[in-house]
Amino acid sequence: ELKLNSYDLGVDIELADAVQRLRFEHPEIGAVVLRSARDNVFCAGANIRMLGKATHGHKVNFCKFTNETRCSIEDATEHSGQHYLAAVNGACAGGGYELALAADHIMLIDDRRSSVALPETPLLAVLPGTGGLTRVTDKRKVRRDLADVFCSTEEGVRGRRAVEWRLVDEAVPPSAWADRVAARAAEFAARSDRPRGAQGVALSRLLAVFRAVPLPVA
């Protein structure tokens, strides 16, 4: 059971498929918004119960696959001009924040509850598994001392402090949230150099691929 918008391998396979379809089938789309349909949680990251039952090899390959999905988001921006925005409305922790880190621009609703966090080390005694530390320091240019504090505490960072620490790009009051997200998406779409009138490439159906190529059982 996936609670708090957590994800397992199946969810990430579908996400990876969606990223490729948006990139190659829809040249008219210049910006994509990652958001949650739930008000109080953006994404809690990988499902802990699933990981607790998994073998070491499964965990390693799961982390590799999820990181490749995040890399594919960044690659779609760098090489295909399709920009991604993360609209964080609620708790955004662990792999959920690592997903947001793959986006060009991170927006955080400033409602005194929503926050971003990488709590794996204090809670589970492990390092973030899908590029969180690297993207915090190398991509977002968070100061090393602040990154150390951020990754060693359970509590997430909210509002203006998250902006000051460079963990997100902007904190938006709830009253302006919907309009600001729409405006920012339009702004990034206008920057895109994707050919609006081009013909997309139809990709094979995901289920058809799985049926044609049986997966080995670990």
What are these language model-derived features?
Residues 39-43, 93, 218:
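Short, active-site-adjacent cap segments at secondary-structure transitions
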Residues 21, 71-79:
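Conserved helix-loop functional segments at active or binding sites
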Residues 80-92:
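A short, small-residue-rich loop immediately preceding and capping a beta-strand
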Residues 1-35, 139-158, 165, 169-218:
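Intrinsically disordered, low-complexity segments enriched in small/flexible residues
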Residues 84, 106-107, 171:
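Short, well-ordered beta-strand core segments
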Residues 93-148, 181:
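CoA-thioester-processing core
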Residues 2, 36-71, 122-125:
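Glycine- (often His-adjacent) and acidic-residue-rich active-site loop
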Residues 14-15, 34, 47, 69, ...:
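Terminal peptide-recognition signature
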